[in-house]
Amino acid sequence: MKKTFAFILLSIISLANAQQTDIRYIPVISTDTISTKANLYPHVLSKNKFNPLVFENGFKVGERREAVRLWDKDIFYLEFTDRKMNKRVFRQMPELKKNGKLFEIMLQGDVSWYRRYFSYRADTWDANYEHEDYFVKGDEIVNIPVKGRYKKKLKALLSDKPEITKEVDQMVGDRDIREILEKYNSK
């Protein structure tokens, strides 16, 4: 009886300790997933504007809210809801040959749209950031750098559907690009 009681007590203690293990580091090659609340600091000048560079500076994970520095090269996939309740998805894109960089998935389809954020002041929470866009159509990759010439490159990429390329001249911002690409992908 004493041996059975000791065995049950030892089993309960070992199970209780096994479930309280803190996550320290998950390597890139791991298939593990961290599901946690993260303290994603907003852009200091505008509380409703999310600064996508916060994961470069690290954020707090786990129940004890310990600071863990996570670099984008250590994260394969990152998904969260921003302050405007928009679902944001970032992942590494090996086909874009920028290994270790996270790209936001703006739109996927026949022509996919990805965005990479960067800054020259990424060491501060209030870093002003820039972005460059990548459009992928089959094996063709079109890179539009910061303040690049969207219209000319998009027209060339979408040239097989002339009715859509006419709309490229009137586009102004991201919403217009999304609408044009959604039309292209649906036809």
What is each residue range found by the language model?
Residues T4-F5, F103:
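Residue-level detector of intrinsically disordered/flexible regions characterized by low predicted structural confidence
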Residues R24-I164:
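Aromatic-patch recognition
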Residues L154-K187:
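C-terminal partner/receptor-binding element of secreted or periplasmic proteins
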